[in-house]
Amino acid sequence: MTRLGFSSSGSATSTLNLKQALWQTLRRVKWRVDSVLDKCGYTLQKKVEGFSFFSQLLNERIKTSTEIVFVQIGANDGTSFDPLYPLIKKSPRQFRGLVVEPLKDKFELLKRAYADIESVIPVNMAVHNTEKEMMIHRVRPDLEKRLGPWARGIGSFDSEHYKLSYLHNSLMVTERVICTTFDALLAAHNISNIELLITDTEGYDFEILRNIDLAKHRPVYIHFEHGLPVGLMSWEQYKDLIRYMTQHGYNISHESHDATAFLPQALQL
């Protein structure tokens, strides 16, 4: 867990720890506000001329596209803090793809969210580069409502991930999930020519994205969670991933907790 104060390792480390602790505190405040707003049917979003850069890109694409083929890894319940769901509900005929969620209770909610959209297929699996099964560490389902909407979205392969939210381990349980690789997922559902890829896996985004052959798969848009302020992805991992993406022709738009990689053609479509 992040600690405040100075240590013998030097002021740079102490400053980083302080920034991480402050960011985590602000994140928890936002989660509390989100909880209150969620009960009233509202959602809190950072305002950047009304939309995030990612949303702006997709809104422009929707105006000219007849079909956006997509894969969303870590879809959760389909609606909570989801950048894609509002766009699909607004223009359902223009999206075709997979929403992937390994946790059983979240998957049932995900199926319900997309029940009226035949072109969106919910998949009850996790994406992992090597393993057929993994344990996901998550908040106890009976406590999620009490803790607030933020608690729905912190399930992770990482057994220490919950500490970023200052939770006690007594609030956590593990759930065994079935895994598949990215390529096997696409093959199983006959998905090719992906235009949009979204990952939100609470700490495994780097491993998934770095393992994708971007010479073979060329999503025009890749939206992912880096979580640098709280350590979901290390700075070295982030730099390596950005280098890999830029070497394959992608531009990068960096936001506080997420990033969007996009091919130059995204601005011409």
Regions found by a protein language model. Name each.
Residues 2-269:
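Phosphate/nucleotide-binding beta-alpha loop and adjacent structural elements of enzyme active sites
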